[in-house]
A protein has these predicted regions:
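N-terminal cap/lid segment of alpha/beta-hydrolase-fold proteins
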Residues: 24-69
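Short, surface-exposed "cap/lid" segments of acyl-processing enzymes
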Residues: 61-110, 120-125
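Alpha/beta-hydrolase active-site loop
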Residues: 129-176
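Alpha/beta-hydrolase fold nucleophile elbow
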Residues: 177-188
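Alpha/beta-hydrolase
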Residues: 218-307
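Conserved alpha/beta-hydrolase "acid-adjacent" motif
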Residues: 313-319
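Catalytic histidine neighborhood in serine/cysteine hydrolases
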Residues: 327-343
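Catalytic histidine-centered segment of alpha/beta-hydrolase-like enzymes
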Residues: 340-352
């Protein structure tokens, strides 16, 4: 009852009070913030209550129904550096992947795992001494007098804690929308996060869409001793963000600088602390990984679409092809996306990818094709 009152109150605030509801009010696109409580398994927070930030994009008409259509609920999972609300809900033109699917009738959620965006940030991430020494140098002398020894000499999060966060959000969404399964869309390190979660919870996952999944077929099957040694977290400056993108440009007009600038502004807004360090950086936890290997992916039967950007130098196309080949699902499609880097959702062929994902999430097929390679944008 409390949840129903909360939703009704929110919608009444978002729908204008003056005048009667119009026939098209059900097509109003909403943005709703949720905070999901989780008992953390992050070593620095073990056993403590943490909050996972979840953004929802949904049409008013869909939200008012309360219960969602069984195959129309989607959860986005981000990669190693960029929180989900920035990665998938870009605040410019038609570059929001979340909005595209929401306008197609999906109830769309995106989550930040612990250490990202608006979710709980473990305390070691507030100490620049916990950066690798090479990264500390950029903050001397403005933030640090000199390079310093770490107060927490271990990677902050791990794939197991990420899976724990994802499960908390999946359970929250299943209860909120009254569905048995949700579909997962993920990017980069989100591949092991969402793909690994799906492999272990195939009864909860409808379909998968994986953009540039960071697959390693020889990844260790079991966790090392945790927390694993190493820098606790990392940062990225604007110049590093731009340089990493530009090295992956392989065709003319691949991306619009205005989109790049909007994404960077949104990225800094998601990290108010990092925005004050030097000229402004985004912070992300170092994450220990294991598990999403040949054995795990080979046992996965969830229908899956994978997408490889032709010019991706972070997760090259042959690495995505390896994941596709090893996947145990019968229904699986590999999209070869032209003129695209690791940041395909912010580039010229984003609309082709968004539409391909909509088709897959709707029917488990791209056109009539349920398996094989599809080339788009050539």
């Amino acid at each position: 009852m409390r949840r129903a009152i909360l939703i009704a109150t929110l919608l009444s605030a978002l729908i204008p009070a003056a005048g009667p509801l119009r026939a098209d009010d059900g097509q109003r696109l909403l943005s709703v913030d949720h905070y999901v409580k989780v008992t953390s398994t992050v070593p620095a927070l073990a056993g403590q209550a943490a909050q996972i930030y979840v953004r929802e994009r949904v049409l008013t008409g869909v939200a008012l129904r309360g219960a969602a259509a069984p195959d129309k609920v989607v959860l986005f999972v981000h990669g190693a550096g960029t929180p989900a609300e920035v990665a998938f809900d870009a605040p410019i033109a038609d570059y929001s992947w979340m909005a595209y699917l929401a306008e197609g009738g999906f109830d769309v959620f995106a989550m930040d795992t612990t250490g990202y965006g608006r979710s709980t940030r473990p305390a070691p991430m507030n100490d620049p001494c916990n950066l690798a020494e090479g990264q500390q140098a950029q903050f001397v002398p403005a933030l640090l007098a000199a390079p310093c020894r770490p107060s927490y000499p271990s990677q902050v999060t791990n794939i197991g804690s990420d899976w724990n966060d994802i499960d908390a959000v999946v359970e929250y969404v299943r209860k909120l929308r009254g569905v048995q399964k949700v579909s997962l869309v993920a990017w980069s390190l989100g591949g092991p996060r969402a793909g690994g979660y799906a492999a272990q919870h195939q009864d909860k996952v409808q379909r998968l869409v994986l953009l540039a999944p960071a697959y390693n077929r020889t990844s260790a099957a079991a966790a090392p001793t945790l927390p694993a040694p190493g820098a606790a977290f990392n940062t990225q400056s604007r110049s590093e963000f731009v340089a990493n993108w530009d090295r992956q440009v392989g065709c003319s007009d691949q991306y619009d600088p205005a989109v790049r600038d909007a994404v960077w502004t949104d990225l800094l807004a998601s990290d108010p602390v990092g925005a004050t360090w030097g000229t402004g950086v985004r912070r992300a936890p170092a994450t220990t990984t294991w598990g999403w290997n040949l054995a795990m992916i080979g046992g996965t039967r969830v229908p899956t679409m994978m997408i490889a950007g032709a010019h991706d130098k972070q997760v090259p196309p042959d690495r995505v092809r390896a994941a596709y080949d090893d996947l145990g699902a019968t229904d699986k499609v590999l999209v070869d996306l032209a003129c695209s880097s690791h940041n395909a959702q912010w580039e010229k062929n984003h609309s082709l990818m968004f539409e391909a994902s909509r088709q897959w999430l709707t029917a488990g097929a791209l056109g009539e094709q349920k398996s094989g390679v599809v080339r788009l944008g050539y």
